Each structure stands twice: as structure tokens, then as C-alpha cells.
Amino acid sequence: MHIFDYSFLKNDLLPAQLVSLASNISALKVMSAFRKRENETAFRKLEDAAKIESIKASNAIEGIVTTDQRVRAIAGGSAPLNHTEAEIAGYRDVLSEVHVNFAAHDFRESDIRAFHAQMMRLANPLTDGSYKTDDNVIAERMPDGRRVVRFQPASAAETPEAMRQLVLAYAEARDDAAINKLLLVPCVILDFLCVHPFADGNGRLSRLLSLLLLYRNGFDVGKYISFEGAVNGRKAEYYAALKESSEGWRDNQPRYFPFMVDFLTTLYSCYNELDKRFASTNAGKATKKSRIESTVLNSFTPLSKADICGILPDVSPTTVEAVLGEMVRGGRVRRIGAGRASRYVRRT
């Protein structure tokens, strides 16, 4: 059986791309928290739109679709009219629970099984959150129409113990101060997908669990910009990363990094989209100067002017350059390098 071990996340030799993504996401998290305090009405509007998009997108990834009008109605509480809509409504119910009560839940078997039962109850009233009783496979359809086995998850016999071990490994890593929790989340989600503990609904549940773990660690952008929508928008990259990282999993040689990079890239895109939508509401009291200052001062790694422009796409390079100059002259940040190679970091 697979051995779950996240101690590698304490390694100082983690890929620079992962460390940079995690650092920039953390800086953007601080910015969004500031905005939320100052603009509650604007964030409520974003939350309503994101909920509809999340319900639509997460189900669409699995081929569960209906009209936009019906998705909006179901998101608003309407009863489902058929089996497809029952599956969509089940996702709606768990998503609402995660949004409202995430602090009361965690990555533990009781919650995972309860979420699955709630997600499936309208489409299959007999579902009680039990793990699969038959082995399942992840198949891929080839261009000539043939199906080939892409991945063999944990067997039905292995699943109960695999889930116990996965939950214990997560709890151990969660309580380890040396492990970056933002890096831990995609590793746990990858392992959940590789166990594939239920007969149906594993993909949709994995996205709900992703939100739960992100919210519990303070990364709540998924409430305001649909994380599921971002996954659906780059579905090919998601499946490619999942395929690459799951190879070797049964032999205890998983390659976590491709899935981690894809997961954090998706999350980073949500924070960038939040920045653009926030700017479009024209409701923010935060000045462009204060946003630039907050971005630099809350980053754990040096940022270039281009990095800051990527984080704040509505702010011109000229404005970024002017504010950085002021911060350097004021002694708040120091400049590393020169010219286009310049990076800026908070003075400690």
C-alpha cells in the first residue's frame, strides 16, 4: 500500500517555482484581506457570482451540464428537475457548507464521508458516504476509440486503511510548523485522487476538499473567484499534471511537483482575477500606491517590477516604478541588482 509522507516539504531544495508561487500567493492573500475589510458590499457581489460559476464549472469538468439559467436557479435554491440537476444541487449544498462552516470541518474521514453523502444524496438517496466496494480504474479514451487504463487507484480492499493513513499523514504535516501549509494542500489532494475512495464523485469532492483546506489556511479567494472555474479553464493542463504526478504512486514514487505547480498556478490566477475584478468595481478605497506597497512589503521573496505588474495588472509600470523608488529612498525596501534585473525586498 502507498505510504503517505509529506516530510519532503521541509526540504530546502524545493523547486524555486513552487516557493515563488507560494510566496506571491501569500502576498496577494494579505491584499485581498485588506480589500475585504474595506469593501464588504463589493465582495458579497463577487461571492454570489463565484458560487454560480463554481457549481457550473466543477460539474462541467465531469460532463454534468445543464443550461446557465437552470444553474443559476439551482444555485439560488431551486429543486432539481432531473438526475443531472440533482448532482448539481448536491454540489451546491456541500459548497455552501464549506463556504459557511469551513472552520467546523477538516480533512478527516467523518467529514469527507459526510460531504460525499451530502453531495450524492439527491441523485442517489441510498448513498451513505461509504467507500467503494469494487475496484475502479481511471481510463482514457484513445483517438481510435479504444479505452486504456491510465491509472489504477487503491483497491477497494486497500481503501479504508489508505484513507486512515492519508488523514493521519495530513494531520501530522498540518501540525508541523516547518511545513508550508499552502504546499501541503495540493499534495493531500493528489493523494486523495490517487486513492479514489468512492465509486463516483471523487473529482468533484476533491475540489470541495481543496476549498476546505485552502479556507482553513486563510486562502479564501475561491469564495470570490471560482477556483473550480479556473480549473475548468485550464482543464488540459490539470489532467496532464495529474497524469504526470500520479505515475509511480502505487510504487511509492509519486511526483508531487507537477500537480503542486498546476494547483498553485490555478490559485494564483484566481488572485490575479480578483485584483482585476476589484479594480473594475471601482469600489476600493485602497490607492494604487498602497496596493504596491502592500504587495512588496508582504512578499517573502524579492519581486521585480514585472512581478508586481503581474500581480497588479491595472497599475501601470510607470506608477510601480515611481512607488518603488519612493520606498527605496525611504528605506522601507532595498533594491537587489540593477536595470531589468532589479528586484525589491522589504528591509528586515
Which ranges hold each PLM region?
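FIC/Doc superfamily catalytic core
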Residues: 1-348
